[in-house]
Amino acid sequence: MTRYKAIISYDGSGFYGYQVQPNTRTVQAEIEKALTKMHKGKTVRITASGRTDTGVHAKGQVIHFDSELDITAEKFQKALQVMTPFDISFLTVEEVPDDFHARFGTVGKEYRYVVKRTKIFDPFSRDFALHYPYELDISKMKLASKRLIGEHDFTSFCSARTERDSKVRTLYSIDFYEEDDETLVIAFQGNGFLYNMVRILTGTLLDAGQGRISPDDISKALLARDRQKLISKTAPPQGLYLWRVDYE
């Protein structure tokens, strides 16, 4: 039995999230269906670095699976690329030690959120970015982001449905890239992220950019440890990308 690590990308707009769910199309289900077919009907399960919600995309999701087939990693990659749908891509496949674990072995992740700042709605980017036709002061967003860097209890910045007992996470950096006059990309790097955390952080920073909240408001929300104390809404899923997963 050999363990394989794969880096995959996918367009999340056609999936009901990553994780297998009854009677819905998911990323995990499509990949496991292809692997099961390759193994002549024997069920093969995959493990990912984490789940993504409906409409959320991935540029660098990491999965692992075990196989007893006597084929190379390169042939696995080519076969899976052919056997999975057009909205999933296998960027790399490689053999890894048996103790590699896509989920429990992570030491950091990067998410990016894409904001289209056009006055007129662009129908061609509707599934891949948030349309935000309002004025934004990027300098205010950068100031606000500094209050979020470091180790904090992010209870105020995650969904009440978060299953983790500890809400303490470390944000290494928040960077802002203005790719052109119309596109703003916010990149979040940290040791881990809670359910809806990046989308709530994005909504908070957008509010800061409009002057609705101040850096002090963010500090108070962190200390409150209560999602209800934060007025910012959760940004919609279509602008969010799991960009990279890091391992030791």
UniProtKB/Swiss-Prot annotation:
GO biological process: tRNA pseudouridine synthesis
Source superkingdom: Bacteria
Gene Ontology molecular function, alphabetical: RNA binding; tRNA pseudouridine(38-40) synthase activity
EC number: 5.4.99.12
Family annotation (InterPro entries): PsdUridine_synth_cat_dom_sf, PsdUridine_synth_TruA, PsdUridine_synth_TruA_a/b_dom, PsdUridine_synth_TruA_C, TruA/RsuA/RluB/E/F_N
Enzyme superclass (EC): isomerase
Gene3D superfamilies recorded: Pseudouridine synthase I, catalytic domain, C-terminal subdomain (3.30.70.660), Pseudouridine synthase I, catalytic domain, N-terminal subdomain (3.30.70.580)
Keyword check for Amino-acid biosynthesis: no
Keywords: Isomerase, tRNA processing
Keyword Nucleus (UniProt): no
A matching Pfam family: PseudoU_synth_1
Catalytic activity: uridine(38/39/40) in tRNA = pseudouridine(38/39/40) in tRNA
Record family assignment: Belongs to the tRNA pseudouridine synthase TruA family.
Subunit structure: Homodimer.
Name by which UniProt lists this protein: tRNA pseudouridine synthase A
Gene source species: Listeria monocytogenes serotype 4a (strain HCC23)
Underlying gene: truA
